[in-house]
Amino acid sequence: MANKKEYVVGIDLGTTNSVIAWMKPDSSVEVIPNAEGARTTPSIVAFSKTGEILVGEPAKRQLILNSERTIKSIKRKMGTDYKVKIDDKDYTPQEISAFILKKLKRDAEEYLGGEVKKAVITCPAYFNDAQRQATKEAGIIAGFEVLRIINEPTAAALAYGLDKKGKEEKVLVYDLGGGTFDVSILEIGDGVIQVVATSGNNHLGGDDFDQRIIDWLAEEFKKQHGVDLREDKQALQRLRDAAEKAKIELSSKLETDISLPYITATAEGPLHLEMRLTRSMFESLTRDLVEMTRKPVEQALSDAKLKPEDIDEIILVGGMTRVPMVQKFIKEIFGKDPNRGVNPDEAVAVGAAIQAAILAGEEGAQGKDIVLVDVTPLTLGIEVKGGLFEPIIPRNSTIPIKKSKVFTTAEDGQTEVEVRVYQGERPIAADNILLGSFRLVGIPPAPRGVPQIEVTFDIDSDGIVHVSAKDLGTGKEQSMVVSGRHQLSEDDINKIIEDAKKFEEQDKRRKEEVELKNKADDLAYYIEKSLKEYGDKIPADEKDKLENLVKDLRDAINKNDIPRIKMLFDELDREKTKIGEYIYKQNQQGGNQQAENQ
């Protein structure tokens, strides 16, 4: 029996819907329909009472009757310790996501008549390390060899950017999906797609627009009948489906009728919901949600040091960008219409398929030399003496990237160091987010400042962070992969960046104070060491003076008395030159004495 042909795919694993695509030998990209014949698959998993696992449209169809055993928007929980409990079994977000990926894989294999093994899977640009790891794990559980995890906006730009060879452009990707909003600014040209800035909101998307319609319908119905449909799970699910349908219809129509017969019943009999929703009413219900995308857009422009008029193209991703009010809002900011040449629902999967074909060296990708360059959303570094944050990889650095810095010990005879890894923009480590820590042990005892410890940060092409510390004297090394299960949303990241700006003056002062204390401690250490070595060459009164100054300085450091530290540091700094004078004077006298004796 002949071996089955192997196919390479790109997958958009979305909050609301997922899409799978492949590149044909003629270089065109085809979105693969699922078993139900649709080009998008709802990211929904259900466990039926009989133990059957339903995924996609079948799961969505029975959501009303089985809402407690149906999981949607699991992507929001990726990278956390969240568990779904069904029949005494706990499922991780990776396992639930793997059910979705397995269905995509199975349906693609059926459609293509071969094996689908290798895949590029996308995630939001703002997914942190733990969330990216979880996405990769979901792919592995589903039976894929995950070639790479790439950012959704980067993938969309790739779908768009192939036709733009030879022309340098600044492109803004506005991605408003079912559960997340991402905005990215990219530079495209000469076969390179570089992300220069990213921003967004991890909890803003189509679900929120649906909720506004649900609340409006429920409130209107309550006024008419005195019944709140949101308290009845089945009625609420029917409202949710109707709201989504109405929202979609209002992108092409000015009004839509919502009819839900037998939505509930009272003692008097059954009740029916019949309402008309106009586009203008929908816009007034959701205008503030669209407005919430303004700040991330401005943040991305600010990070890229660009003005709206510097953007050559705006491309839309996510079904929500079909909403006329969203397109009008974008035109108001940029003074130009967004490019509609990319299907917003499929662009990400198409880009992922192109990248997959390039990485796997597929026939259709021959001659397509595309380089994707992603960036780190926040600065990465470690805690150093005095609790300061020492950046190693700055925010918005292109990845993959590897950077090292050499550090030393803070105490005499220190035989181990703790490497504490942080992410953030503040100069004091404790004000940033601790990603994890590890210890490097077995450092040979030596005076402080002598050992050489090289700390290396290595971010791979999936955005996963590897940190290592190496004692350059012994070659001993310790490392870790940052996989702390903390969820850092886009809101959190934007807040971190805003806080850094807000506390800039205060942080600058605190940093200067810590640096002064560190310098004072180093000076006190130097004087003590010098007095030990050369004390016999220094007059007793001068030696006493220096010892008292060191004692007072250490006391001021312990009490955090900044003005006194500064005063004593300056005085001790002036006095330290006398040590050298006395040493050289003694040596000269000794030398002259020797010359006379000869």
From Swiss-Prot:
PANTHER family: HEAT SHOCK PROTEIN 70KDA. The modification Phosphothreonine is found at residue 180. Keywords: ATP-binding, Chaperone, Nucleotide-binding, Phosphoprotein, Stress response. It comes from Thermosipho africanus (strain TCF52B). Induction: By stress conditions e.g. heat shock. This is Chaperone protein DnaK. The keyword DNA damage does not apply. One of its GO terms (molecular function) is ATP-dependent protein folding chaperone. PROSITE patterns: HSP70_1 (PS00297), HSP70_2 (PS00329), HSP70_3 (PS01036). Acts as a chaperone. InterPro entries: ATPase_NBD (IPR043129), Chaperone_DnaK (IPR012725), Heat_shock_70_CS (IPR018181), HSP70_C_sf (IPR029048), HSP70_peptide-bd_sf (IPR029047), Hsp_70_fam (IPR013126). It holds the Pfam family HSP70. The lineage of its organism: Bacteria, Thermotogati, Thermotogota, Thermotogae, Thermotogales. It comes from the Bacteria. Belongs to the heat shock protein 70 family. HAMAP family: DnaK.
